[in-house]
């Protein structure tokens, strides 16, 4: 079996602590409240040393007329605790509502989205039992910068924003992550054969920074053929770093190749704050049926425990989860 997420080290992790750590929790929408309730119950039983502040965000706040889906007092909690465990939320359909995930990432400066994609063969079916890939996704720029406008009634435009500081932060984070976790290779995905300025800048920065890590192999792939290789032979990759849009799409694909999108958690890391979550959505049609699997959010919480210096609890929780799926208790 692949290494446990509990053993993963985060370059931004705090030192080991025995005092309760303040965190902010949002129970979310759809299946969010039930999987958050299960996750918090597990953390409590495992002895997690946490001081929880709860905030209300998402659909209910949107429908009260707040287009951002989050109120000022919630921002105060996030800036105070600097650690956010978030269940999935629902953004109402229609114009005028902003993506809360994008808003939180940009407001708190969460520049790195880290998604471990690990196979749990033979307990979770996969064609790639040796898969152990970490995708490091730039989290603030690219087409997700939110710079859209209408040129005419029939022409809409979305600008792709790539900056040198943004590239430097995410690429260096990927190499530091690889070094800290005894990984062997960092691979860059981009499309600079077409987008020569934007993706070209990302590629150049990758090549520049890779020279500071001579013990690590550095290579790069055009994203389309790289995606095909990831689907066919994920064992060929170790740590992947890429701009926002590619990372959003391929991290879901990689999680499904490993076994299931529903099992994957992620961390969103900034210089001062961090957010942890499942990578799946709020699944409102499954809400209230007691069938939602909390594993994705639980894995996000495990990454959070490592981040706040409670790797002992993280290992305890993850070992219990492994025993559970070994016993066949999973959806």
Q: What spans do the regions from the language model cover?
A:
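Buried hydrophobic positions in well-ordered alpha/beta secondary-structure cores of metabolic enzymes
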Residues: 29-32, 82, 136, 174, ...
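N-terminal beta-loop-helix "entrance" segment that forms/cooperates
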Residues: 49-72, 228-230
């Amino acid at each position: 079996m692949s290494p446990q997420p509990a053993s993963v080290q985060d370059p931004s992790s705090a030192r080991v602590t025995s005092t309760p750590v303040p965190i902010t929790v949002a129970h979310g929408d759809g299946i969010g409240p039930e999987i958050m309730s299960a996750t918090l119950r597990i953390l409590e039983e495992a002895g997690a040393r946490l001081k929880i502040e709860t905030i209300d965000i998402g659909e209910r706040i949107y429908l009260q007329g707040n287009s951002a889906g989050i109120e000022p007092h919630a921002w105060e909690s996030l800036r105070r605790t600097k650690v956010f465990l978030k269940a999935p939320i629902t953004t109402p359909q229609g114009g005028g509502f902003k993506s809360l995930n994008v808003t939180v990432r940009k407001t708190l400066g969460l520049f790195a989205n880290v998604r471990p994609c690990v196979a749990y063969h033979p307990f979770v079916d996969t064609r790639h039992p040796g898969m152990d890939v970490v995708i490091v996704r730039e989290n603030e720029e690219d087409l997700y910068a939110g710079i859209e406008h209408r040129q005419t009634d029939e022409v809409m435009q979305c600008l792709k924003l790539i900056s040198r500081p943004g590239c430097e932060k995410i690429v260096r984070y990927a190499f530091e992550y690889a070094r800290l976790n005894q990984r062997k290779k960092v691979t860059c995905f981009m499309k600079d054969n077409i987008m020569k300025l934007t993706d070209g800048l990302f590629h150049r920065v990758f090549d520049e920074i890779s020279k500071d890590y001579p013990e690590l192999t550095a290579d790069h792939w055009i994203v389309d053929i790289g995606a095909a290789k990831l689907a066919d032979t994920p064992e060929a990759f170790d740590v992947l770093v890429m701009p926002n849009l590619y990372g959003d799409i391929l991290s879901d694909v990689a999680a499904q190749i490993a076994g299931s999108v529903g099992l994957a958690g992620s961390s969103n890391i900034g210089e001062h704050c961090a957010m942890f979550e499942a990578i799946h959505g709020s699944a409102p049609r499954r809400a209230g049926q007691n069938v939602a699997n909390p594993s994705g959010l639980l894995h996000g919480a495990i990454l959070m425990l490592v981040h706040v210096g409670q790797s002992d609890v993280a290992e305890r929780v993850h070992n219990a989860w492994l025993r559970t799926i070994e016993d066949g208790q999973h959806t």
